[in-house]
Amino acid sequence: MKVISNFQNKKILILGLAKSGEAAAKLLTKLGALVTVNDSKPFDQNPAAQALLEEGIKVICGSHPVELLDENFEYMVKNPGIPYDNPMVKRALAKEIPILTEVELAYFVSEAPIIGITGSNGKTTTTTMIADVLNAGGQSALLSGNIGYPASKVVQKAIAGDTLVMELSSFQLVGVNAFRPHIAVITNLMPTHLDYHGSFEDYVAAKWMIQAQMTESDYLILNANQEISATLAKTTKATVIPFSTQKVVDGAYLKDGILYFKEQAIIAATDLGVPGSHNIENALATIAVAKLSGIADDIIAQCLSHFGGVKHRLQRVGQIKDITFYNDSKSTNILATQKALSGFDNSRLILIAGGLDRGNEFDDLVPDLLGLKQMIILGESAERMKRAANKAEVSYLEARNVAEATELAFKLAQTGDTILLSPANASWDMYPNFEVRGDEFLATFDCLRGDA
């Protein structure tokens, strides 16, 4: 990493810990800053704060006392999850204390070029796909950002010959000023996180910050399936490379079941390692990045054909007696499950669905359920899910949890069938998060395979 003097002997407050705050505190300390960490979790329940204290970093835990800002801090580094209407943040802005984001801090010291990926859906899969393809092509791609590897930690080991492939949320982008990736991808834009941003317009504005400092020598990859992309493309200085599953564009596109880049056929959609229309979009964005990065077509095709997905995101788990299992526990809403179902033959598919009851009906899902071999329904939303199954004329069984649902599905399945966990609901009625729910599916698969 580059050693910079910008923060030498500067008083800096880290507001909110978690992985990114801990990484930022360590990086700034290494750069000579006088760091104070403030986290709302009590100290005795806060191993990260305890570890930082042992390293000589000042920590204040249990609350966010506004009077802390009277200590003449010169910068604040804010955890992405803390909104700008937080009293501490509002007070810092009123005192004209510059607020930095952890990803911008990483950018300041990065020797490696950055490929930034954002969007409403598909960020993690596309980020992982891109890194896999670049590494397969002999480059050194390092995953970072919102994918679980704090950018300010990864950047400390990155060298000029590496590439940081960085997943970026709207929370991380809303406060950037200098951040400039060489290549940026916006997978799609949907109305999400409106409780944080206030409106779809403000949400889009946050996402659009990814390209704010880009120039014509940089590349911005946009989803041409969405009308909003054409409007946004007119306002960037970056060179725009579109991708589309609906039309031929001057970039990456799907035509007659083949994925192309500028008239060069790369791979058949049926050869992709992960199913679903959304994964064709993810693959097209990946192809665009790979071609801009000089990766050969055969390597791109080989890598995409072997890509098994990201854990809990339409992850191909494996087969037992020619019955294939997919873990899509991350699908916590109707749209995500619709996209998952688009990649399968319903007549050979057993769907496990249901979870937290948020009060919504599943009428929009009914057309996607038509022709399903069977549904296994679970969770608080079971009655609503059963109504959708009845409208689609799909038979169903009920289960008490994911393990029981998976066992039932396996008993019903025949050679050539697929079992898909894609709940269309959040997990919190039965599980702490979608990861724990998905892990139960994976563990049950392992048990069934052991007994087979």
Curated annotation (Swiss-Prot):
InterPro entries: Mur-like_cat_sf, Mur_ligase_C, Mur_ligase_C_dom_sf, Mur_ligase_cen, MurD
MF GO annotations: ATP binding; UDP-N-acetylmuramoylalanine-D-glutamate ligase activity
Residues reported in the UniProt entry to bind ATP: 119-125
Designated name of the protein: UDP-N-acetylmuramoylalanine--D-glutamate ligase
Name of the encoding gene: murD
Xref: PANTHER family: UDP-N-ACETYLMURAMOYLALANINE--D-GLUTAMATE LIGASE
GO BP: cell division; cell wall organization; peptidoglycan biosynthetic process; regulation of cell shape
EC number: 6.3.2.9
